Structures are given as C-alpha cells and as structure tokens.
Amino acid sequence: MRKLIFSLVTSFFLLLPSVIRADEGMWFLMFIKRLNERDMQKKGLQLTAEEIYSINNNSLKNAIVQFNGGCTASIISPDGLVITNHHCGYGAIAGLSTPEHNYLKDGYWAKDRSQELPPKSLYVRFFVRMDNVTDRMLSVVNSSMSEKERQDALNREMEKIQKENSEGGKYVVSVRPFFQGNEYYYFVYQDFKDVRFVGTPPENVGKFGGDTDNWEWPRHTGDFSVFRVYTDKDGNPAPYSPNNIPMKAKKYLNVTLKGVQENDFAMILGYPGRTNRWVSSHWVDQQVKYGYPAWVEASKTAMDAMKAHMDKDKAVRLKYASRYASLANYWKNRQGMIDALTAHKTADLKRAAEKKFAVWANKPENKAEYGNVLSDLATYFEKTNQEAANHNYLLLFFRASRIVPQANGYVKQLNTYLNSSSDQEKQQIRERIAKELDAYYSESYLPAEIDLFADNLKLYADKATDIPQEIAQIKSQYNGDFRKFAAEVFARSIFTTKENFENFMNNPSSDALQSDPIAQIARVMIDKYYNSQSEALKDGYEKAFRKYVKGMRDSKVSLILYPDANSTLRLTYGSVKSLPKDKRNHDVKRNYYTTFKTMLEKYKPGDAEFDMPKKFVEMYEKKDFGRYLDKDGTMHVCFLTNNDITGGNSGSPVMNGKGELIGLAFDGNIEAMAGDVIFDKKLQRTIVVDIRYVLWCIDTFGGAKHIVDEMTIIQ
C-alpha cells in the first residue's frame, strides 16, 4: 500500500483548539490525535490515537466495517466473525428464511462452517485511508458558475481522484463534501462480497419489544446477529464460492465480560448516516409543520396496507417483514422528531444564533458576501413549505410501491433492447431484467402490492398540491377509487407478473412498452419528483446554504466543531450514563442498565411484541447464567451511554477505554429525537445491548459455544 501523504492545507480541523469536549461530536479518525486524544485519555481511554487509527499499522479501524451499506459491524475473531444488530441482518435473514426453515422467527446457529449460509446479496466495507482534497476540488469552481456547472466540474475532478487512488479497481474511492461543500475529503475502501449468515437469536429475542419499545428506554432487546467474511485463498475479496475461506482478520476486537459502571468511558466507531446540525431555523420550521407530518401519514398508510396482508398469511409476513420494520422505524422516528424539535424549541435556538450571525454578516467587511444569506434562505423556505409535504408523500409512494421506480429503469433498458442490433447485448438485458423481476416476484405478494400502490397513490392525490394532470384525471375518472384503478393497472402491466413479462418478451414492441400503465405512472411521478422546483430556486438555496455554513464557522457563532454525518467512519466518545428519571423510564434514578428480571416483567406469552422463548423463563428460574452474570448478581441486558450517534450507527461496537467490546449500539432515545438537528447534552443517549447478554444468548441459550470459543474473551 502506498504511504499516505497528508495535505498540509489550511482547514477547519487544523485551526481547532487541541482539546474538545466529549459526548457531542462525530469525529474524523484522521484528526483525533490533534483534537481528541488528550480529552479521551483524561476521561478513561487507555489507548493512543495511533492504536485507534493508523494508516500503515493495524488499528481499531481495521476491525470496523460498514455492513451492507446502511449499518455498522465489527470483526470479533481471527477468522472474520462479524457481529452487528439483528435489525441490520434482518433483510438477509428474511431472504434465507422459508415457512419450513424460518430462521427469522425461530433463530439459527450454524453448527460448523459448512452450515454458514450465503444470502442473496450482502457485503461489508473496510475503511483503508482518507485525505483532504479541499484545495484541489475548489480550484475547479468559481462563484460565477450555476450549481449545475459547479457540480459537473466537481464530478469531473472526483472521477480523476477516484481513478488515481483505486489502484486499478482494487479499492472503492469516494470523494465527499463536508460543511455544505466548503471542504472535500476522499475515502478509500475495500469491499468483501462473500459474507455468510452464522446465526441469530429468535425474533422474539432480537426484536423483543417491537414497535412499542422502539426508541424507548428501558429496553430489553437482544438486537444482534452474526455473520462471517470469506475471501479467496490469498485473502482477497471474491464473489461467493464454495472454495473461499474465512477471512484472516488483520484486526479483531477482544470481548470483555467485566461489564460497565456508571461514568465508565465508552466510545463508538461507526458509520453515522446523516445529521442536519448546520441547518437554519427555517428548515426546522418546514420539517415540523410540513415535511415530517406528511412522512408520518404516508408511512402509516403503507404500514396499514402491508400489515393487513401480513396478519393473514405467515408466508406473506416473511416477505414483508423487513420492509415493514423499515417503514415502522422511520414512522416513529419522524413523529418523535416533530415532538422533540417542538419541545426543545429548536427553531427558536437556531433563530437566536442567526441574530448573532446577522450582526456579523452586516459588518462592512462581510456584507458583500454574507449580507443577503439569511434573507435568501427565508425566501427559499417560504416558497417551498408545501413542496416539502408533497415531496414526502411522493417519496413514500415510491417506497411503498417498489415496482414503480423499478419499472422506470426497466423501460430504459428495454428501449436499448429494442434498438440493439447485438444479439449478445439483447440477451444480457433480457437476463438481467428477468433476474431482477424474479427477485421482485419472490419478495412480493400481488394483492399486497396492489393495495400499497393504490393507497399511497390515493393519499398523494388527496393531500399533495400541484399534482400531475394525469393523476388528477385518474382520481376523477375512478371517483377516487384507486384500488379499482390499481387492480386494472396491475392486470395489464408487463412488469407485475412473470407471465405478463414473458408474454411481452415473446413479442416485444415499443408501442406496448410506451403504453404500459405502470411505466406511464413511473414517468409522470418520477418527473414530478425531480422537477418540482425550478433550477433558479434550487441554485439560490444551495449557494445561500453553503455561504451560511461558511459564515457560521468564520464568525464563530456556531459552537459545532465537526461536520454533519454522511456515512463516513466517525468516532464518538463519552461515558455510561443514566437518563434523568421520569415516568417514561420507570422513575428510576440509577437507570443506566436493564436486567433479565425487568425483561420478564414485560413478558406477555403469545404477544406479537413481548413474547419470549419459554426456555428463557426456565433458565431464569434456574439462574443459569454462568460467567455472564454481573458482579451484582444480576443478568444485565442493555445499558445507556451518552455517545453521539444516528442512523447508520446501528450495530456499531461500543468499546471501553482499552478498546474492548462491551456492547452493540442499536437505538437512540425518544426524549432526544431532535439529536439529528441539535445535540441535547442532558438527554441524548445511545441504547446498547450488553455484550454479556449477547454471549449468553449464543452460548448458553443457543448452544453455540463453538462460536464464542472463536473470540478472545477478557474475564
């Protein structure tokens, strides 16, 4: 590997003080020696910054992976054993499950390597290195460019940087903007695509508490699943092959059974997906009043349609389990955001900061560049408030009815097919679409798909403003009966059944393709989604927001000292910490952990959310917990830290000061749901499943001691 030479450019990070406060912040590993090491060690870290992040030597970052693009996981054995959340592995596990072998419901533990199962599609991504390319990227743009011209120029430079650092395709290279395009860094990754399912607890352990307990504390969810990374015989990434071997890990985490006490040091490495802490007060107002309410309503509409079919048929429930869980998660999140942003008066706090910024912006030396920034932002949001609701009704229609956005892509491919003179190209297109549609058919249930399409299209037609003329005509023609319309459309479309598609391919024609009703709906709705705002309006906002962020930093008005999350590897550190007592968390003062006993208090035999294996009750009565008991004599299940996380951190390893695994992050608390916009030092918490409970579930309850034996256990 080439030695990385850091850019010695003047950057935000290099100008920061050498000590940063803990708790708040999603920090770049590249800068922790300069910015965080001293503070972390003062609070209990027993490692050096080099032991956390090193380019040329093995460090903790080599044991952390992005899991399937949306979660985090960690390597916990020399042979590539990977642990993440149950809800992160949910889709892969559901895809492997059948009514006869329902791994999702019943759980599963591979007895040996031959029983480790390959999901249809799963990968992990290792972080290799990063560097600052701000000067290079900004040298290709200027203030006279439109936003499209600017982005085109940036994209061209990104492609060059990616090519220069991919080493002929060995690595995946991503150039990412930070601080709203005021800084740029590139990231080098290596992907491994042979990842096999090793085991998971039963669903009534991995999802104990269900939607009711989601985002809540106290919590008792055994939210974990286990996989393994495989490589070719030389240790390189390779597609699935029975000849592949378990990865020989460069670095893996030791697992400790010592447990935690309140105020113990705790740090998390992971891939937080997205935060919006630099947004203006206008953004907060728009989301609370328009955007989030539409999301909540549209999510619930899709969930109700889905659940009606899931409740009638176990096979259908399996097909839709992962999609339903995703919808339910965001539904509760968005409602929690509305409540938290309102309760904490977040918009008012933003307005107070903007008043200070306005004073600075209107100073003679700043006015030319920053004088109009706040008014430009205000104008944009005034003009787009209703559009925020329209956008989310439309977005959730696409999420509910997957065939619509998929059909749009198929039409493009089939047009190429019809115009191609190459038999080889035509065969490749035909096989590719057939394979994708087969996956759709196997994961879908036609009556449910019809209702999802109909109900969310009706909601959009009834609630959105400025709907396309074609949708208004359908509403009028069918007197608002979108289920009748959907049934007719699905009967006629070439994409909705395998038989219809094969009939079309036996006699393909451009006329049939262009007149396909699903394809027509897709064209109309996707065009509306991407073209609802004028280029001038979008240009004005992007320029104003970029200047706003730059000005807030230059003026020192903002106390935020880190970039928003954007699915790049970050570190957060803090401590094990109780929540302030209230009725919501059982009015317990020292409530930083939960126990097996308090989990049994929630137990409801046969309940969809609070059932548990009968064996759990029997083992509790026998006190069959062995070495996994806490020194207080109880079995701890979950605990709290005040780390700063968001979506994408699911599955992240929570480590003590020695870098040993103490648990897995799997949720935040609803009291601090505004955390993506503003960090609440008093209430922000990370909910963690205790690694001792995880190991007990694998070893004692699951009978898979051989898996635990792979790990390095610290007694």
Swiss-Prot record:
Q: Keyword check for Isomerase, yes or no.
A: no
- Tell me what organism the protein belongs to: Capnocytophaga gingivalis
**What keywords would UniProt list here?**
Aminopeptidase, Hydrolase, Protease, Serine protease, Signal
Q: Which GO terms describe its biological process?
A: peptide catabolic process; proteolysis
One example GO MF annotation: serine-type aminopeptidase activity
Site (Critical for substrate specificity of DPP7) found at G668
Entry EC number(s): 3.4.14.-
Report what the protein is called: Dipeptidyl-peptidase 7
**Got any disulfides in this one, which pairs?**
none
Please state which protein family the record places this protein in: Belongs to the peptidase S46 family.
Q: Which gene encodes it?
A: dpp7
The record's active-site residues are H87, D223, S650
Q: Which InterPro entries match?
A: Pep_S46, Peptidase_S1_PA, Peptidase_S1_PA_chymotrypsin
Q: What does this protein do?
A: Catalyzes the removal of dipeptides from the N-terminus of oligopeptides. Most potently cleaves the synthetic substrate Met-Leu-methylcoumaryl-7-amide (Met-Leu-MCA), followed by Lys-Ala-, Leu-Arg- > Leu-Asp-, Leu-Glu-, >Leu-Lys, and >Val-Arg-MCA, while this enzyme does not hydrolyze Gly-Arg-, Gly-Gly-, Lys-Lys-, or Gly-Pro-MCA.
Leader peptide range in chain numbering = 1-22
